[in-house]
Amino acid sequence: MASSRLASALVPVWLVAAASLLAACSGESSSDASEESTGPGSSTIVATTTILGSVAGDIVACADPAATVTTLMPVGADPHDFAPSSQQVAQIVQADLVIANGLGLEAGLDDALDNARSDGATVLEIAELVDPIPFGEHADDHSDDHADEAATEDDHADEAATEDEHEHGSEDPHVWFDMTRMATAAELIGAQLATTGGTAYAECGTEVAERIRAAEAEVRATLESVPADRRILVTDHDALGYLADAYGYEIAGTVIPSGTTLAEPSSADLAELVSVIVTEDVPAIFANSAEPSTLAEAVAAETGRDVQVVSLYVGSLGEPGSGAEDYLSMMATDANLIATALTR
């Protein structure tokens, strides 16, 4: 988890208020109408997130244009707080294959995924299969500068971190921010679909993986165009660790010092973040398009600097016309937003 410098004074209270196993391990308000994009033979395929639905949908469309994938979450849903409708729970339990992210990302689906496993469905949890990294692997290490000033706050932060690990796991579930890992995910999905649908699915998994790798080269060029000394990220929650790992960025701090949007920052956390932004001369806070940016905007204002709040597509694709309608365009759009904000 991103570690930062502690400020000597607390932020005002108003700021807070503004606040490799392919096992047969089966797995804001939801919309009753799931998006469809029927699968191999008569199999029923369900993907949890819009990102997985995009990748799986491309594979299925390549192998059998008449087949579909049902995506549970609507565009704009935050996977961390998504709660399924009764109809969606039934879709999960009745599915032959559920493609989930795992590692605690879709906490609201845990019971339904467990029931699906019990009923004989295969639940393919992608994140644990693509070499996940621990939270905070690319956090800023310079926070030691102020460690002695805030021992009490550090104790509280340790307690919060422990609670977060219990809820969310110690491994980061946001694997889609490394496109090479998602290329591997496409191959895994294709291989799993091929077990019931034939070799065309494996071949199409490979084809989609190659498309992802080709697109990753462009994303890499965009992100690497940012000078090394400007590759400093402040985000709404700890979601960009894989991007930082893949492209040489540093996570200097997070508005919510957690791997989930469900946590809440303390006044000390926010004071710490304001200090980091000022000290590092960070020009932008990257928010989540699926969540209100009020707290990030309050932090930006408290710095007294010209700090932009830039909304990224973090856990969901964008609406039609957003430039983030599928996984590849989402990553390209996010890369451009990051590069533009950090080089202005």
Region locations from a protein language model:
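Extracytoplasmic metal-acquisition and chelation regions
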Residues: 2-15, 21-344
